[in-house]
Amino acid sequence: MKIIHSLLISAIVTSSTLISSVASADSFTFRIGSGHPKGPAPYVTTMSDFFAAEVKSRVAERTEHKVNFVEAYGGSIAGVADTLESVQSGILDFGGFCICFEPSKMFLHNFPYYLAFGPQRSSDAIAAARTVYDENPWLKQVMQDEYGQVFLGLGVWDNYHLGTKEDWNTVADLKGIKIGGAGPNLPWLEYVNAIPVQSTLPEGYLALKTGVYTGWLMVPSAYNGFKFYEPAPYYTLIGFGAMPVIALTVNKEKLESLPQEVQDIILEVGAEWEAKNGAAMDEVQQFGLAKLKENGAIIKTISEDVRIEWAQSLAQFPKTQAADAESRGLPGLKVMSSYIEASKSVGHVWPVEYDLE
């Protein structure tokens, strides 16, 4: 009887262990999205091909859990100006978006736009921005405190240039010309008396085609990907700088509800996604220029004198933005000074010395 009793206890313990093991192996389905499409927007491509793919594979390899992603890019769930709010509300679990479309809520996070003619290489720009985020943890903390999401990593637009319907050679040639852009970079146009028009990449082709505006401030990869070279074939290399203003975030409550080992993998892959973006976008810049040329765009480089003239016209812009940030109770001087110095530390030489005070 004792033997039978022991066997029964052993069977119960074994059964309980198996049930516990099965119960602890969960399956999670996440919604990840962006207002930009995969392909024409390289950061969305890496969200899908690297971030989502790596989280899925690492969770499967290193834990008992499984994850799957429902991928919703190109605005199928949230548009370019709605992704922050969609992650905040939980409509999306993960979102990738350009901070440029949140000029009010994320005013100071747009600091690279306020300091035009910054680092030309994406890898340098994202390294400088990482220093700024590390020196100013408020930039990440505010996303949690005010918008209910955890910042996973930075993405970057490669070096900005200008595409137009007609050729131009001097800053004066742009006076009165309507040019599209995304929020924070529009003042680059105002200071040379062009007429800035707030717009988005998805609507750009038709707007150029129909004459809503006759040019676009845009990186070559996106200018090519969205085929802007068809209605506006002149692409002039100016070098406004690469812009590390892409954010990848996750809903805070969703992240905290997950097993710790899954949380750790998500944070780990987010950091690696950021690390990959700089070098990847350096390659994208060259690929984009090559494809533009192949597709018939007329590419030229602006003269250094004209570039310096444009940079000098913007000399007061950083001071204005820093003061605006301070008036909102934000550490504008500290953050923008950090970026100026961090850019110098990666070897960048500013064409004009910006005075913030």
Positions of PLM-derived features:
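Bacterial N-terminal signal peptides that target proteins for export
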Residues: 1-9
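Bacterial N-terminal signal peptides
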Residues: 9-17
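Intrinsic-disorder-associated interaction segments
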Residues: 11, 132, 328-332
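N-terminal signal peptide c-region/cleavage motif recognized by signal peptidases
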Residues: 20-22
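N-terminal secretory/targeting leader peptides
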Residues: 26-124, 139-357
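Signature of the catalytic double-stranded beta-helix
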Residues: 126-140
